[in-house]
């Protein structure tokens, strides 16, 4: 037996051992506890961070003051004031600083005629999944993600025919003369939502605050099975802190700590088999990424805290982030233009294998451009891979023949 055969056998044994370890760990993982039935979203106290993030001494504040029309905040009594937004690809329900429901109109839940669209964000306690954003402050009043109210009142709006975008404004009026106007902007044929917060200080004192953006989800109960692609997909939280990181939704979610990673130009995301959601702060913003398990561990949370602003009297500051709610379309993901965001496609946890997977997909996509059929494109890719590996296979057969 020559050295090549020994190496191949050793490599095969190593791969088999690693696969067995991973299978054993997943098989032994207990089911996540179900969330008790409820009619409202998660309690405010369970998902609002404490104001521990440092606020910079000098925020991004323009010199000239900007006048803002006075806004009276409506008390939160009875049903919360919500706005339903319809675009050509999305239907969303906004409740202040939260996106409580998101339907992907071009993706039916099943092939059954009349099947409803895939619902990525949901208030259903068993499938609870939402994106939230609010503010915290050490010494001043600040709005959490429940405090914003629609500036034009509750109701339903739609992207008009011939229009490329639609904006939906929310507002919070603080008791100290501080107004925060939040504007959601939706674009045609886009799953990317711009979320812009404008802080205007008409009060006598300096206002300091830090914005937080988070994704909260009840971990899905995935049934194991050879025909269920979800059982082979990564279900957990991912983020970029200078390198690609991820944690599975299981009992180990917080085993390695709550992260507390500070990064400039990072992002947070929750991917699943075909779709994902992500908060992408501005490239120049510094955020602190952390994990949590609120509601007694029944839900998993990933949060990006920051940036902080310091707004003097008569001044204003603005912070903008993007919220992605949609499918894993490679060309659209590349257009997001954020470092490492293409890793949400989950070619592999390991960078070298992810690079290989990206290369194979590029070849597959190239073949599809010529052939026009995914089935034949896959067959063509397999043939090309076989041809590329032919010299190695030939050497292996010659070795076995000896």
What feature does the model see in each segment?
Residues 30-31, 333-355:
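Interfacial/capping segments of alpha-helical transmembrane domains
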Residues 82-344:
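Soluble non-transmembrane domains of integral membrane proteins
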Residues 349-371:
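Hydrophobic alpha-helical segments of integral membrane proteins
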Residues 11-16, 376-387:
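Hydrophobic alpha-helical transmembrane segments of multi-pass integral membrane proteins
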Residues 199, 314, 385-402:
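Membrane-interface amphipathic helices and adjacent TM-edge segments
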Residues 3-7, 371, 375, 379:
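Hydrophobic, aromatic-rich alpha-helical transmembrane segments
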Residues 9, 25-124:
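Juxtamembrane extramembrane loops of integral membrane proteins
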Residues 2-27:
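Hydrophobic alpha-helical transmembrane signal-anchor segments
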């Amino acid at each position: 037996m020559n050295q090549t055969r020994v190496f191949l056998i050793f490599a095969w044994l190593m791969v088999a051992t690693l696969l067995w370890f991973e299978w054993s760990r997943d098989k032994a993982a207990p089911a996540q506890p179900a969330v008790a039935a409820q009619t409202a979203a998660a309690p405010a106290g369970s998902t609002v961070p404490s104001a521990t993030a440092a606020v910079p001494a000098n925020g991004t504040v323009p010199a000239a003051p900007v006048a803002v029309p006075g806004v009276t905040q409506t008390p939160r009594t009875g049903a919360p004031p919500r706005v339903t937004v319809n675009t050509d690809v999305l239907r969303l329900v906004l409740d202040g600083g939260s996106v409580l429901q998101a339907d992907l109109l071009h993706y039916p839940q099943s092939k059954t005629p009349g099947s409803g669209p895939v619902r990525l964000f949901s208030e259903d306690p068993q499938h609870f999944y939402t994106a939230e954003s609010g503010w915290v402050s050490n010494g001043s009043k600040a709005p959490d993600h429940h405090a914003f109210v629609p500036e034009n009142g509750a109701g339903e709006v739609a992207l008009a025919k011939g229009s490329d975008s639609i904006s939906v404004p929310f507002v919070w009026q603080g008791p100290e003369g501080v107004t925060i106007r939040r504007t959601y902007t939706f674009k045609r044929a886009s799953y990317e939502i711009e979320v812009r917060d404008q802080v205007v200080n008409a009060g006598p004192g300096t206002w300091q605050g830090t914005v937080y953006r988070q994704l909260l989800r009840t971990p899905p109960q995935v049934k194991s099975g050879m025909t269920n692609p979800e059982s082979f997909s990564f279900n957990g939280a991912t983020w970029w802190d200078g390198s690609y990181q991820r944690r599975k939704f299981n009992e180990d979610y917080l085993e390695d700590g709550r992260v507390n990673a500070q990064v400039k130009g990072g992002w947070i995301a929750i991917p699943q088999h075909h779709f994902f959601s992500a908060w992408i702060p501005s490239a120049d913003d510094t955020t602190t990424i952390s994990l949590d398990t609120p509601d007694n561990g029944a839900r998993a949370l990933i949060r990006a805290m920051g940036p902080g602003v310091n707004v003097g009297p008569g001044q204003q500051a603005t912070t903008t982030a993007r919220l992605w709610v949609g499918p894993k379309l490679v060309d659209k993901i590349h257009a997001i233009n954020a470092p490492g965001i293409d890793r949400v496609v989950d070619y592999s946890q390991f960078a070298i294998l992810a690079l290989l997977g990206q290369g194979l997909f590029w070849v597959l996509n190239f073949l599809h451009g010529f052939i026009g059929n995914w089935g034949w494109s896959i067959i063509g890719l397999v043939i090309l891979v076989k041809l590329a590996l032919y010299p190695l296979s030939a050497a292996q057969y010659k070795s076995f023949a000896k």
